[in-house]
Each structure stands twice: as C-alpha cells, then as structure tokens.
UniProtKB/Swiss-Prot annotation:
Taxonomic placement: Bacteria, Bacillati, Bacillota, Bacilli, Bacillales
GO molecular function per UniProt: arsenate reductase (thioredoxin) activity; protein tyrosine phosphatase activity
CDD domains: LMWP_ArsC
Protein's name according to its UniProt entry: Arsenate reductase
InterPro entries in the cross-refs: Arsenate_reductase_ArsC (IPR014064), Ptyr_pPase (IPR023485), Ptyr_pPase_sf (IPR036196)
Record keywords, A-Z: Arsenical resistance, Cytoplasm, Disulfide bond, Oxidoreductase, Redox-active center
This protein's encoding gene: arsC
Organism in which the protein naturally occurs: Macrococcus caseolyticus (strain JCSC5402) (Macrococcoides caseolyticum)
Family statement drawn from the similarity comment of this UniProt entry: Belongs to the low molecular weight phosphotyrosine protein phosphatase family. Thioredoxin-coupled ArsC subfamily.
Amino acid sequence: MEKKTLYFICTGNSCRSQMAEGWGKHILGDTWNVYSAGIETHGVNPKAIEAMREVGIDISHHTSDLIDQDILNNSDLVVTLCSDADNNCPILPPNVKKEHWGFDDPAGKAWSEFQRVRDEIGHAIEQFKLR
C-alpha cells in the first residue's frame, strides 16, 4: 500500500512543526510520509532538538523550510499547528484535507514549556494514529 503524505505547518518551521515532524516519522513512519514547513523560516530551535533528543528522537538533521507547493498540493492531510499558519495557509486543492491542531509556541520560554508542548504534540499524533 502506498504511503499517505502528512504536512505539518507553523509560522517559522522552528519548534512545533519540527517536533511534529519528528514525532510523526517516529509514530506514523510505516504508513505516512511526514514533512514540515513554515510560512517563514526561523531556523530549527536548538531547544526543540534537545527536547526531542530527550525522548529518543533525533531531529538535529532537520532544516527550517518554506512551504513546498508540490508537497502541499500532493498531501493527503495538512495540519496547521498555530493560528498564524491556520489563517495564512495557502489555498489547498480539493483533494487535500486540512486540520488545525493548535499548540502554544515554546520559543523564548522556559525549558519546561518545550517539554510540555513536545509531549502534547506527541500525544496528539498518537491519538491521530488511532483514528
């Protein structure tokens, strides 16, 4: 069976979408191709890398990328992770489903916020797998 494509989008492709891509590949990698991107690029946040390393997932090789129209238009599901991305997501073809899963932005906040948001994203992806 061909894998489906899941595209996580947030503002800067720095924290939330990077962690979601890491979790997604870890949890859904056998059935989904998982990517992430941003409306802008802010670089991968080192604390996001460290937070994911803490749960055994390596995202240190990830890059901060702008939305790729080819991936976007060929996705089965696009998930926005912040209201900015939800409001500014490009128009999608009718075959692409879109969902919004809002998470707080941990950037510039305490380490515990990175851990909390990381765990919330992981839980959401675990729940998604059960659908």
